[in-house]
Amino acid sequence: MKQSMVFSPTLREVPADAEIKSHQLLLRAGFMRQNASGIYSFLPFGLKVLHKVERIVREEMERAGAVELLMPAMQAAELWQESGRWYSYGSELMRMKDRNAREFALGATHEEVITDLVRDEVKSYKKLPLTLYQIQTKFRDEQRPRFGLLRGREFLMKDAYSFHATQESLDEVYDRLYKAYSNIFARCGLNFRAVIADSGAMGGKDTHEFMVLSDVGEDTIAYSDTSDYAANIEMAPVVATYTKSDEAEKELEKVATPDQKAIEEVSAFLNIEADKCIKSMVFKVDEKLVVVLVRGDHEVNDVKVKNVYGASVVELASHEEVKELLNCEVGSLGPIGVNGDIEIIADHAVASIVNGCSGANEEGFHYVNVNPERDFKVSQYTDLRFIQEGDQSPDGNGTILFARGIEVGHVFKLGTRYSEAMNATFLDENGKTQPLIMGCYGIGVSRTVAAIAEQFNDENGLVWPKAVAPFHVHVIPVNMKSDAQREMGENIYNSLQEQGYEVLLDDRAERAGVKFADADLFGLPVRVTVGKKADEGIVEVKVRATGESEEIKVEELQTYIANILK
């Protein structure tokens, strides 16, 4: 492709609203442009990268036995109402009405549509298993779109769905697609981890996220320093053991703590270590209010609270709800004196506290010498806190470290969550009606482009891996007015294309500095510069990833490039 014919507007300055490298560079290099908050146009070079990621996805999905189809972006509300998600999915679901006031959603995901499609067509175990996928635009009404393609309101996604007669069949396909995902992200050149995850609004169980390691990631990964264990911090169980001290229990005492609300403030004011304080929080579990206790140096993991109750929705109780329940401010909450009708659950670590402190459910006061079971009753001790760095790894090997990650893929074992809700059944080999067993597998295709850009860049621009680069080679005749340089550049361009390489020829009448700056921004794997030594048959070859350059004879160029790009 000749650069003079391409729409690739570059920017010298960093856009003011672009916070992270991938967002900045994809805009500066002319790979995309913003249409509205969280909505982007892919320009020609960006679209080439997107298509290359799509191709890798398609190759690996089809190798895993999945078949492509395409479903509508606009979905009837009735299907979402049938599954129950019309009411539970929340405000991120983009809803609309047609001229007849019939309600629709713009698809954030397609479980309902695919289940409806398959239940009408697949009636026998003989047609199972079946794995279908699509690559299609999704919509999500993000409250705060940010980070460019990483959190947008419109994005390209590959979503696959598998249908099975048995759990064993689901397990087999799940493992196959797990490996396909690993292959996809490895082929894209990404440094990633597959981690144990929470299924969230999707439902189901046994789920893994594929996380690209990056400091700008919105998720925290807990991983072992000596084993392969990795999990989203929300899902990492705590296996610590707590030893109760043999300190004698002291008499409970209420003390004044004026203007001291946070654990750090209270512990400093009372000269008590945070790990001897009891942190009390009120959660709304579906429609039930529950008091949750953790040690003062720990944080409540609301996903674990949700899993204790098998709840659909768990959120912190509002200030008004806390006031009505316990007649106190949030900063003064404590378990002592709580009405017996209100359930109290606690993390395992709380049981080991001796002569600790807690809120007194009275503004400006706390209790000291608090002892669980003597001073208050707990209905259940269980794992309720977030794992911390330095904790023992849940697999028993090594200790936990943290890293940030960008979620680019997610695989779920949905089970019968949707098939039961939507009456999607089949006849098994005994002629009995059974609900279809399902799996769900998603990849953020446009998000993967951003994740690659986030991992592969330097101070000068993008540094694309060969597999997804818009072109393999960038040929730059420095001076297009020089017949020797122009002709050699065009000859190299034609010759490399004949060898099967994708080549970009900078045939613009621009200054050398502009050409080189744009080349660095674009980040193609190899740059061939045709300069003043063209008369001698010599060109300069530069590897973008390493910055290494070498002058070689033009007749050696094809072999040289083949060695770089092999």
UniProtKB/Swiss-Prot annotation:
It catalyses: tRNA(Pro) + L-proline + ATP = L-prolyl-tRNA(Pro) + AMP + diphosphate. CDD domains: ProRS-INS, ProRS_anticodon_short, ProRS_core_prok. This is Proline--tRNA ligase 1. Keywords: Aminoacyl-tRNA synthetase, ATP-binding, Cytoplasm, Ligase, Nucleotide-binding, Protein biosynthesis. InterPro entries: aa-tRNA-synt_IIb (IPR002314), aa-tRNA-synth_II (IPR006195), aa-tRNA-synth_II/BPL/LPL (IPR045864), Anticodon-bd (IPR004154), Anticodon-bd_dom_sf (IPR036621), Pro-tRNA-ligase_IIa (IPR002316), Pro-tRNA-synth_IIa_bac-type (IPR004500), Pro-tRNA-Synthase_IIa_type1 (IPR023717). It holds the Pfam family HGTP_anticodon. One of its GO terms (cellular component) is cytosol. Consists of three domains: the N-terminal catalytic domain, the editing domain and the C-terminal anticodon-binding domain. Catalyzes the attachment of proline to tRNA(Pro) in a two-step reaction: proline is first activated by ATP to form Pro-AMP and then transferred to the acceptor end of tRNA(Pro). As ProRS can inadvertently accommodate and process non-cognate amino acids such as alanine and cysteine, to avoid such errors it has two additional distinct editing activities against alanine. One activity is designated as 'pretransfer' editing and involves the tRNA(Pro)-independent hydrolysis of activated Ala-AMP. GO terms for molecular function: aminoacyl-tRNA deacylase activity; ATP binding; catalytic activity, acting on a protein; proline-tRNA ligase activity; transferase activity. It comes from Bacillus cereus (strain ZK / E33L). Its EC number is 6.1.1.15. Its main location: cytoplasm.
